[in-house]
Amino acid sequence: MSVAAKYYPNEPTEPKVVTSEIPGPESKAKVASLGEVFDSRPAYFVADYAKSSGNYIVDVDGNKFLDVYAQISSIALGYNNPALIEAAKSDKMIRALVDRPALGNFPGADLEDILKQLLKFAPKGQNKIWSGLSGADANELAFKAAFMYYRQLQRGGHGIDFSEEENSSVMENTSPGSPQLAVLSFKKAFHGRLFASGSSTCSKPIHKLDFPAFNWPHGEYPVYKYPLSENEEENKKEDDRCLAIVEDLIKSWPTPVAALIIEPIQSEGGDNHASKYFLQSLRDLTSKYNVVYIIDEVQTGVGATGKFWCHEWADIQPPVDLVTFSKKFQSAGYWFHDDRFIPNKAYRQFNTWCGDPARMIIAGAIGQEIVDNNLVDQCARVGDYLFEKLEKLQAKYPTRLINLRGKNRGTFIAFDLETSAERDQLLKLLKSNGCNVGGCAEKSVRLRPSLTFEEKHADIFVDALEKSIGQL
C-alpha cells in the first residue's frame, strides 16, 4: 500500500472544479468579508481545511485542487494527516498549548525530550538547536548568533567580558557596543521580511519598500545554463565569476563582513540552484576570512529535494556554522555544532517564548513520519519520474517550458515562461484545470508538493499542465 493510500484512503482520485472561475462566488464573498478585519488582498481562494485531504486542498465553493504548492512549501505530509492529528491530541501538546511556557526562564520537564526528538533530524555535522517562531525569525536569530560569535573572537575569546565603553555606547546605538558589521547575502535572495532579514533579502521591491535597511552587500548568485550536463564548462566559469565577486566584497566592504547567508536553491528568487562546487568554495572563503557561514534551509529543507536537507547534496566540509529552518517543519530555529555560538552570557539570545513547544512537538512528529515511511527516498523517486515527464513536455512545447531545472532534486522543480504575463495566465489556467501551483521571480513556475505526492499525482499534474499550455 502506498503512503498516500495508507494516510488518506478518502483522498480524491482527481481534481474537481465546480465554479466557472477561481476564486468562486463563496470565496469572493468570504475574502471581501475577511477584508473588513484583515488584509485579504493576497488570497487566491478561501480554503475549507476540514474537507481537504492528503494532496488535495478544497475551497469553500467545493472545488478540489491537486495542491502542488502546499502552503508555499510548508505542508510536509498532506492535509489532515492522521499521525499529526494524534500528536496534536497528546497530553504533552495540550500542556504546551494551554500553558505555553516562557522556555528561557521556565522550561518544562519535557522540553529536553522534545528537543532531542527534533535533533534526530538535524543536518549532518549539527548537534545543537536554538528555536524560533518563523523563517525570518530564524534568520534574525542566526545573524545575532553570528555577530556575538564574531565580536567575542575580536575581544579575545569566549570568556572576555564587555568593556565599560561597550556597555555605555550600546545604549546610544553607537560603536563599539553597537558595532558596524555586515551580513553578505545574494541578489535575488529571500531570507524574510523583518529588518535584518529584510536587509539580506533582494528578490522583489515589494518585500522591502519604505523600510530602513542595513548597508549590507549582495553578491552574485550563479545563473546556470540548462541542461546542466551540456553546459558544465560555462557553468563552472559562472561559479568562479560569482566567487570572485564574493571574495572581493568580503575584502573591500567598508564594514567587516561577519557572516554570509545563502539558500542552496533560491526559491522566491526564481529556483536558482547553487552547485556543489559553489557551496563548498563558499565554505573555503568563509573559513579563510573568518566569516560565519549560514545556510538558509527554510524552504529547501525537510525532504523536498531528495535529501532531508538540500545542502547535504554538496557534502560541505567542514560543516557550515549555522543552518536555519522552518516551513515544512512547522517550527523554526537554527542548527549549530560549535559551543562558541552559545552567547558568553545568559539573556543575550532570549525572548519571552524562545520558540514554541507545541510547534516543536509537531515538527518532531513530522520528522518521525518522514523517516518511518522513507518519504525522502519517495520524494527523490517521484521527482525523477516527474522530471522525466516534464522533459518530454518541454521537448513538445519548447517555448512554453523554458529552463526546466531541478533534475535529481526531488520534486523541487521549476521552469520559466517567456513573460510574466504568460506565467500568470498559466497559473490561472492550472487552477481552472484543478491544480494549485505557485510562481516565483518574474516568470517562473515552482513545484512544491507535499512529501506524500506520488506518481499518480504527478500524472494528473502533467496532464493538467499540458492542457493549460494548450489554452495559453
UniProtKB/Swiss-Prot annotation:
The PTM N6-(pyridoxal phosphate)lysine maps to 327
Q: Which residues bind pyridoxal 5'-phosphate?
A: 135-136, 352
Q: What is its main location?
A: cytoplasm
GO CC terms in record: mitochondrion
Catalyzed chemical reaction(s): 4-aminobutanoate + 2-oxoglutarate = succinate semialdehyde + L-glutamate
Q: Which CDD domains match?
A: OAT_like (cd00610)
Q: Which residues bind substrate?
A: 193
Pathway entry? Amino-acid degradation; L-arginine degradation
Q: How does it assemble?
A: Homodimer and homotetramer.
What's the protein here called? 4-aminobutyrate aminotransferase
Source organism (scientific name): Kluyveromyces lactis (strain ATCC 8585 / CBS 2359 / DSM 70799 / NBRC 1267 / NRRL Y-1140 / WM37)
